[in-house]
Amino acid sequence: DLALWQKQFGDTPLSVSVNLSSRQLIRRDLVSDVRSVIARSSIKPRCLRLELTESLVMDNPEQAAHVLTKLKKLGIGLSLDDFGTGYSSLSYLTRFPFDTIKIDKSFVDDATPKRSVLLRSMVNMAHELGLSVVAEGISDQSDALELRQMGCEYVQSFMFGPPVAGEQVPRLLKEQIAASQPARA
């Protein structure tokens, strides 16, 4: 589907993120399967992103490091999902080849005065390590604006719309592209 959408909306950068399960991560043929999907679908590897949770990586850190390094060599993106909620060490941010962290919704929802300090610290740390940042579970425009001002590149939220089936994506993209075009007089 992604390759078709890329042809249909050539000037619009499109990518897809896929959650990886622990069972998939330990499969011996995972890397060759991903390589095959990329070749078969004719998508650019950089348009595919795999998302893994901290706990998934922690189940077997040596195996995870080995597999993730091979996957990264294919040119795909790797995201550390639910960042900050697991029992990992910050050293894993340098040990594993992630290029993005996804700050867990619990930090965005936190109503304590320390919320902004924690969020800003995570965004700054990620950037210092060369990682991009996605904040999950944004509840309103003020959250989105605050995170943008902190330097968070992406936000993810049902506020922007619910998940949709693949056949609905072209219509949604057309609507978003039309809405982003300047009005003509």
Language-model region placement:
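Catalytic core regions of nucleotide second-messenger enzymes
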Residues: K7-L14, S42
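Short conserved micro-motifs at the rims of enzyme active sites and ligand-binding pockets
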Residues: D29-L30, V37
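Conserved C-terminal helical docking segment of ANL/AMP-forming enzymes
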Residues: I38, K44-R46
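Conserved catalytic network of the ASCE P-loop NTPase/AAA+ motor domain
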Residues: G10, K70-L71
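Short catalytic/binding micro-motifs of nucleotide second-messenger systems
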Residues: D1-Q8, I38
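Structural preference for long, well-ordered alpha-helical segments in enzyme cores
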Residues: D1-A3, D33-V34, V67, M122, ...
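EAL-family c-di-GMP phosphodiesterase catalytic domain
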Residues: Q6, N19-R28, C47-E62, L74-A185
